Amino acid sequence: MAELISKEGNKVSFRVAVPAAEVNRAYDQVWAGLARDVRVPGFRPGKAPRKVLESRVGKGYVENEVRDRLLQVHYPQAARELKLSLVDARIEPEPLVSGQPFSFTVRGETYPEVTLGDWRAVQLTATAPEITDEVLNRTLSDLQERNATFQTVERPIEATDQVTIEELGEEGGSYPVYLDVAEPHVRDALIGKNVGDEVEITVPAHQHGDHEHPEHTVRVRVQSVQTKQLQPLDDEFARSLNFESLDRLRTDLRAELERRARQEGDAARREEFVNQLVEGMQVEIPQALIDRRREAMLEEIQDDLGRQGVKWSEYENFMREQGKLDEFLSDLAKNAESRVKRDLALEKLAEDLGVQLSDAEFSNTMNALAQANGLTPQQLQRQLGPNGINAYYISLTREKALQQALATLNGQQVAGRQEAGAEQTAQAAEQESGQPQAEGEQAAEQRGE
């Protein structure tokens, strides 16, 4: 039985009383497990008396196991009974005695109450970039550049040439330099030189990785000069790119640019809407919620570093030496708060809209996500695990609510709208989900959903 003691804002405390019969049942379950798992010389498995088992594992061990079992069952059950969604809790158990009732007190912070502003009155200003003839021609020029060839010439080096140089000295070697993207000090030193010339290049002081490099001079010899040859924009160029004609290339390229522009416009409108949704939200966020997200984000960073062979302690010391650790931790806390606010706003939006995800929608999107990552649906499910699947379900629900709200603002018919497709929905939800265990998932666990 659960009894609410106090509730002030997000702060709450309640007391839970567990009947003696439940306590005895928990003791019986723990003793049965010990009898099965603990081997006692002279006794067959499961036949050792409790006193003998207690002498092997200790009375304190048995009590801890029983207490943990009771708390795991009756704490979430009490939270559901009182309709509380706890973000953070401190449990204060009273003494545990076999054959007697067991009580404990819970003090913590509840999942916050969220109130959204009138999001239907939001005016979105973001638009898709216009694909003009100038944009199309610039993209065609980029295609020419990417498909350029180089021809060896006998003349002084010019600004757009590719130059092969040999670094003189014991550790020298030959390598190409593309002058149109080279550093200014390299470009200035080489322009006007000829094959066979020896050139001194002064390299400014700079930092590379963890190391500071002072200003120094490198001596090189010019081995060859090649000039860039651009193919003319004609049908032959188009056919080299597997298009039947230049007109077809221009038509298909414009269509692709317009598709990307629509995606860019949609992404900008999404971000603008979510930002305004968060700005109009009224909520008192428990610090524990932000702290938990910050810790999860830090663990993700540590995992990423580990995959690159870098220990977090080494990276932390490096940032401390550079005087950047405090800034890093401050930015991490700000990002954690921002993510929590987005999650709360989108979860409340889904609740207000009554958004539900059908089994077919979830299955289709999971299949699309698996395919996009080169996995079978079964492999993806094993990789995510139960918590990950539940968190992803919540992310998809948020995404569906976001799409529905945007469609409403656009004056579009929401029912049956399938423009985004399962794969795009999966990608968008994955970007919004942030961490494997989202705030909404943990609230759902407390609510018993």
From Swiss-Prot:
<feature type="domain" description="PPIase FKBP-type">
    <location>
        <begin position="160"/>
        <end position="231"/>
    </location>
</feature>
<feature type="compositionally biased region" description="Low complexity">
    <location>
        <begin position="415"/>
        <end position="443"/>
    </location>
</feature>
<dbReference type="InterPro" id="IPR036611">
    <property type="entry name" value="Trigger_fac_ribosome-bd_sf"/>
</dbReference>
<dbReference type="GO" id="GO:0015031">
    <property type="term" value="P:protein transport"/>
</dbReference>
<dbReference type="GO" id="GO:0051301">
    <property type="term" value="P:cell division"/>
</dbReference>
<dbReference type="GO" id="GO:0003755">
    <property type="term" value="F:peptidyl-prolyl cis-trans isomerase activity"/>
</dbReference>
<keyword id="KW-0143">Chaperone</keyword>
<dbReference type="InterPro" id="IPR046357">
    <property type="entry name" value="PPIase_dom_sf"/>
</dbReference>
<keyword id="KW-0413">Isomerase</keyword>
<dbReference type="GO" id="GO:0043335">
    <property type="term" value="P:protein unfolding"/>
</dbReference>
<keyword id="KW-0131">Cell cycle</keyword>
<dbReference type="GO" id="GO:0043022">
    <property type="term" value="F:ribosome binding"/>
</dbReference>
<dbReference type="GO" id="GO:0044183">
    <property type="term" value="F:protein folding chaperone"/>
</dbReference>
<dbReference type="InterPro" id="IPR008881">
    <property type="entry name" value="Trigger_fac_ribosome-bd_bac"/>
</dbReference>
<dbReference type="Pfam" id="PF05698">
    <property type="entry name" value="Trigger_C"/>
</dbReference>
<keyword id="KW-0697">Rotamase</keyword>
<dbReference type="InterPro" id="IPR008880">
    <property type="entry name" value="Trigger_fac_C"/>
</dbReference>
<keyword id="KW-0963">Cytoplasm</keyword>
<protein>
    <recommendedName>
        <fullName>Trigger factor</fullName>
        <ecNumber>5.2.1.8</ecNumber>
    </recommendedName>
</protein>
<keyword id="KW-0132">Cell division</keyword>
<dbReference type="InterPro" id="IPR005215">
    <property type="entry name" value="Trig_fac"/>
</dbReference>
<dbReference type="InterPro" id="IPR027304">
    <property type="entry name" value="Trigger_fact/SurA_dom_sf"/>
</dbReference>
<dbReference type="GO" id="GO:0051083">
    <property type="term" value="P:'de novo' cotranslational protein folding"/>
</dbReference>
<comment type="function">
    <text>Involved in protein export. Acts as a chaperone by maintaining the newly synthesized protein in an open conformation. Functions as a peptidyl-prolyl cis-trans isomerase.</text>
</comment>
<comment type="similarity">
    <text>Belongs to the FKBP-type PPIase family. Tig subfamily.</text>
</comment>
<dbReference type="InterPro" id="IPR037041">
    <property type="entry name" value="Trigger_fac_C_sf"/>
</dbReference>
<dbReference type="GO" id="GO:0005737">
    <property type="term" value="C:cytoplasm"/>
</dbReference>
<dbReference type="GO" id="GO:0061077">
    <property type="term" value="P:chaperone-mediated protein folding"/>
</dbReference>
<dbReference type="Pfam" id="PF05697">
    <property type="entry name" value="Trigger_N"/>
</dbReference>
<feature type="region of interest" description="Disordered">
    <location>
        <begin position="411"/>
        <end position="449"/>
    </location>
</feature>
